[in-house]
Curated annotation (Swiss-Prot):
Cell location: Cytoplasm
Family: Belongs to the DnaJ family.
Species of provenance: Mesomycoplasma hyopneumoniae (strain 232) (Mycoplasma hyopneumoniae)
Domain J: 5-75
Domain of life from the UniProt record: Bacteria
Residues holding Zn(2+) 1: C152, C155, C210, C213
Protein name: Chaperone protein DnaJ
Amino acid sequence: MAKQDFYKILGVEKSASLTEIKKAYRNLVNIYHPDKNTKKSAEEQKQAEAKFKEIQEAYEILSDETKRKQYDKFGHAAFDQQFGGGSSGFSGFDFGDIFSSFTSGFGFGGSQEQKYSRPLKGENFQAKIYISFIESILGKEISQKLTKYDQCDNCKGSGANSSSDITTCYNCQGRGMQTEVLNIPGFGRVQNKTTCSVCLGSGKNITKNCKKCRGKTIVETKEEVTIKIPAGIQDGMFIRVAGFGGPGHKGGPSGDLHLEINVRQHKHFTRSGNDIHVNMPVSIIDVINQNTVEVPSPTGLKKVRLYDYYKSGQIVNVLRAGAPDPKNPRIIGDLKVHLIFYIPEFSPRQKDDLNQVFAQINDKTKAK
């Protein structure tokens, strides 16, 4: 008897995403699982069991990227014991998929049973946060409501309504893994271990879900958090907010939230390392008279003494007026003041007076 199309068994299109396949599988399991049909007649139970096995087989293939590609290319023949005895059939085949299948099933990197049975930390999340240039130099505290995932306190992370609603998975006998034989063109029969298609690696079946988390084992809450941005932080750096990532597995801790700092550009200031640069227009009169001028900085005005030998474009250092090092606040950069000379406006009479003065000056720069 010819096997039915796996996509039709699950009631999904051939282009269905993995999320759609998982959703369809869970809906069908909820209908045809043996534990859901105990009150029906013997014949109906037998039909439900046969249907359930079809659903398992279809899900086992379509939920695995490698097997799904093989099925889409070769159909049921990819898993037939008589297929692949020869050395042909490599055209268009992805060897990367083959070897990823090997490494996932042959224990490279550790036991798969251990992987699914031990507590694992949740996935780390990443987000961006935008601050001004001045805030990056001075530091800032931000209060924000963040999503947090905690273990359900009603079921203690089991997902079941009570302990009596948890049974050992009949398909994998509690191991979380199942063994299968693949017939890969050019390789012959290959034994492989995959995640159990019934319990999805947990080793247990739940007959009644927890009323609070509905079997998800975790609950989602909102928590007000104060995020401290250290003084001197630079664009592209990260701040870690512990415990605000994805939910842990098997009672493991939640992952972390990594905030990428994005510093907006400033109209006047730029930064290089811990040094801050600023262009400062100064009157040539202040330079000639060697006056002291006030220069803006992120922490306020700084006084700079001008000297008559300065030239336009000269860089004047104001020590420790730059940015603090976020890892060591005792290290502080300098303020680099780029002098830009300008000539003030003069009245015609003032120009005449200046010309008389200039006529008496021996301009040595003309010889250069």
